[in-house]
């Protein structure tokens, strides 16, 4: 079977309506189930970017590292679109944050009495959209 490695695909969306811009960052093939990432993501969705990064940095969850990295990537994309290198975390907000299920690697483990037990190694895709609103 294939080995899935975490990839980060960066897409930039530029929307100019009343000087509101947004950017997107996607982290794919995260080696954690979508359900476990969604548990942390539900807490972060309501925050501004600065508060979300602060919450995630001190969170003990494994998923918080991936989410924080993706948020920082989306903010960097937005600053690149704007052409502004000054980062004020309270000026950016999280517009969308969702996680989808990725491919599942299936492995077999030896079980008692000559049987084999199937192990599922889930992965997930995380998408974050940041806006200047």
Where are the predicted features?
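Ribosome large-subunit tunnel/peptidyl-transferase-proximal elements
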Residues: 2-4, 9-99, 125-133
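Short, solvent-exposed beta-edge and connector elements
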Residues: 32, 112-113
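Short, low-complexity, polar/charged sequence segments that are solvent-exposed and flexible
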Residues: 75, 113-117
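A short, conserved strand-capping beta-turn/loop at the end of a beta strand
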Residues: 98-111
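C-terminal binding/interaction regions
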Residues: 105-106, 116, 121-133
């Amino acid at each position: 079977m294939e080995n899935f490695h975490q990839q980060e695909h960066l897409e930039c969306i530029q929307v100019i309506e009343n000087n509101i811009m947004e950017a997107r960052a996607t982290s794919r093939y995260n080696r954690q189930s979508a359900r476990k990432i969604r548990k942390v993501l539900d807490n972060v969705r309501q925050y501004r970017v600065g508060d979300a990064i602060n919450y995630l940095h001190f969170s003990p969850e494994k998923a918080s590292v991936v989410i924080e990295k993706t948020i920082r990537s989306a903010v960097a994309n937005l600053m690149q679109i704007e052409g502004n290198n000054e980062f004020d975390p309270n000026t950016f907000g999280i517009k969308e944050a969702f996680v989808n299920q990725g491919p599942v690697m299936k492995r077999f483990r030896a079980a008692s009495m000559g049987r084999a037990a199937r192990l599922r190694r889930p992965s997930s895709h995380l998408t974050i959209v940041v806006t200047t609103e």
